[in-house]
Amino acid sequence: TFNANRQGTIKITGTSVDTTYNVTVAGQSISAYTSPSNATYDVVLTELKNRIDGLSISGLTTTKLKDSIRLTRNASFTLSGTAGPFNNQMNVFQDQVATLDELPSETVHNHVVKVVNSGALTSSYFLKYVANNGTSGPGYYEETLSPSTSTGLDASTMPHELVNTSVNNFTLQRIPWVARAVGDDDTNAHPSFVGNKITQSFFHNNRLGFLSADTVSMSQSGDFFNMYHTSAQTITDSDPIDLSASTVKPV
């Protein structure tokens, strides 16, 4: 189960002499820190981490990384911060960012963030950080599924397949439907038959299709058991097709 605001990131975007840094975590503020003449990212981040740890906030864990500090807690918390004369030397966020520029260059493995993009529900997407060593440090971001969204279809309630296992022997078994891997219910919705009765199945143009009420749902092209998009950011010709008919009566 996903719980909002249990993680946070403080990203340093620049250092200079006599820059004042302010951070408030869960309503508690560190004493303002002014960077010395030898200020580097490591110096600033180490001092900020020490001061945050000194607040002794229950359940709070901090991790210093290349250009950021990651905070996690076993309960929701608030996070804010400022740095620089024009507040341009620190980015602070929790579960989401507006642009990719706000993300740290490195973070912990499996750190998931929502990119709001233009602000519209259908333009948002989720990224997960994959650390090369499986822990933290150098790595890359890849598109992923919202942590509050189900992975997809329930094979026990979906159509099954009859498999010829040997001469005159058949096995009725569940189909290994491809899990939903990216997006959420707004950007990569369930096919329309979910929650309804499937009345007919068919193949068309290298797709598996299902009829349900006044809708028709077809799989990825050439991938019969995949009813979801592979990206919430782009649309391709091979993506699933889901249509609603204007009437269920023959014309």
What are these regions (language model features)?
Residues 1, 55-58, 62, 108-113, ...:
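Short alpha-helical segments and helix-capping/turn motifs at coil-helix boundaries
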Residues 1, 5-7:
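Extended, well-folded catalytic/binding cores that form a central cleft or groove in large enzyme
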Residues 8-13, 45-49, 53, 97, ...:
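Short, well-ordered alpha-helical packing segments
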Residues 9-81, 108-131, 158-160:
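Extended, beta-strand-rich, solvent-exposed assembly scaffolds of outer structural proteins
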Residues 44, 48-52, 80-184:
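N-terminal accessory interaction module
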Residues 67-70, 170, 208, 216:
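Hydrophobic residues embedded in beta-strands of well-ordered beta-sheets
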Residues 175-207, 211-251:
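Beta-propeller and closely related beta-pinwheel folds
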